[in-house]
Amino acid sequence: MNGKLIVFEGVEGCGKTTQMHFCSQWLESLNISVVLTREPGGTELGKDLRGLLLSKSANKPISEITELLLYAADRAQHIEEELKPNLAMGKYILCDRYTDSTIAYQGYGRGLDMSLINNLNQIATGGLTSDITIWLDVDVEVGLSRKRGQAKLDRIEQETIAFHRRVQRGYTDLYVSYPSRIVRVDGSGSQEIVQQNIQKILQKRLFS
């Protein structure tokens, strides 16, 4: 069996992490070997980088370019240490965020140069793209209200509503640009309905 890279994307509070875990349980019930991972933080080095990137207690803010480079470093290590080896072993990797997050957050959200971002993504990934990306689409205000009701907000979650709306626009543009790779799922319904829709998509795209 060939390995597959299935990525879950979306704005804060879209439910991607929850749905990813539900998908893992479903795939394992089909006797498929599954690996759960995330960016940033999918390796030991990545965990340290995640702390730097998401901590809201830093004495000095991280510059936008530094932020971009830290995400790229996390991704490069993640691919070499986790993604490539597990794909080679035929495993299904479920990844919480990948390259589209960088385009949406650092490109659209921060307004950084898109050619720079694309070049860094290419260097970090070596051209490794997802087999399918599930974009959980929810209204920005709905997603942020979910996050506020769950836990303390990290540095990114505390950004302005205008920032998060730009991020959402980025995901919308990516969906339009890459229809063969990115599938939109309405994330506003119940967890059960959303999961059913995701399973139908994966059945069609990966198993038919």
Language model segments and positions:
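Walker A (P-loop) phosphate-binding loop of P-loop NTPases
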Residues: 13
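ATP-dependent small-molecule kinase phosphotransfer cores
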Residues: 32-125, 197
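A glycine- and Lys/Arg-enriched "phosphate-lid" helix/loop adjacent to the NTP-binding pocket
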Residues: 97, 101-169
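Pre-Walker A (Motif I) flank of P-loop NTPase domains
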Residues: 2-5
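Hydrophobic positions on the alpha1 helix immediately C-terminal to the Walker A/P-loop
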Residues: 19
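Hydrophobic anchor at the beta1->P-loop junction of P-loop NTPases
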Residues: 8
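NTP-dependent small-molecule kinase module
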Residues: 24, 141-208
